[in-house]
Amino acid sequence: MNGIFTTLLYEMEKHHDTVLCTIIADSGSTPRGMGAQMLVGEKGLLCGTIGGGAVEGQSIELGKRLLQERRSTVHEYKLHHNDTEDIGMVCGGDVTVHLQFIAADDPAWQKLAGEILRRIALRQPGWLTLAPALPVMTERT
């Protein structure tokens, strides 16, 4: 998580928008589980991984498109042979990825990333909750 948010702040300081990709649900056999993250910029992967392979590759391409459209989305990948969206993986599971557009000038994300890095440096616990409206960092009790 340190690398993701260090890179996010760096990109924001350079006035570069990004997309934060987070696995928000998984079932069956998958390369990575819920909570895995990567950060995507206009040229592709900046930091992190959500498991490599087709899921990561397609999420990077979708992330680059979302940067141009300046929007977020949720995308579900089926990692088994199917007739609707076969991506060629045979792991047997399903993965849902939240792709969150982050504008470089968004003060809420700047504050959140700084707070996360501060807590990591001080080894302070906390909960990161990503909701559609606004990210929030709360005390863990």
Where would I find each of the regions flagged by the language model?
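Segments forming oxygen-rich coordination pockets for charged ligands
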Residues: 1-141
